[in-house]
Amino acid sequence: MQRFPYSLLLLLLSATNRSRRHHITRPGRSIHWCLVRPTRPNRMLRAIRTCGARYWRNWPLNWPRKAGLTRRSSARIGLSDALRPCPTLFGCFKRRYARQAMSCYCRTEWRVNWLKKKRRGSSRWRRESSVWRCWK
């Protein structure tokens, strides 16, 4: 009888592991939420793994720290405008999405749609008196 390839099992387990929430996802992995930094649009966008309702309960408080933002940088980009759901699964890691016209969901929109997953309209980033806003 052949020996079972345990490395394959480990590979499968690591692929389905959702408990590691602080690591930055790579383009090959599934991306759930991305942190948009409009002040440095040419940089690779950072994606953050989330882990269910317990994580979201104190959402506005724990986001900046989890995202690795300092107080100064979060003030500069405007936290509420900077944190958005990912536009597409792999989209936020393609360089062209990192420009000013990055497609995004508006906050009011995903708040509603996150509970009942309906069709989400597309929107765009716009600069408005030194604040980045998500527009339809």
UniProtKB/Swiss-Prot annotation:
GO terms for cellular component: extracellular region; host cell nucleus. Its main location: secreted. It comes from the Eukaryota. This is Secreted RxLR effector protein 63. Induction: Expression is up-regulated at later stages of infection. Keywords: Host nucleus, Secreted, Signal, Virulence. Belongs to the RxLR effector family. A motif (RxLR) lies at residues 43-46. It comes from Plasmopara viticola (Downy mildew of grapevine). Has a conserved RxLR motif that acts to carry the protein into the host cell cytoplasm. Lacks the 'so-called' EER motif, which is found closely behind the RxLR motif in most of RxLR effector family members, but the presence of an EER motif is not always essential for the translocation of every RxLR effector into host cells, or for inducing a hypersensitive response. Residues 1-21 form the signal peptide. It is found in: Secreted; Host nucleus. Effector that partially suppresses the tobacco programmed cell death induced by cell death-inducing proteins.
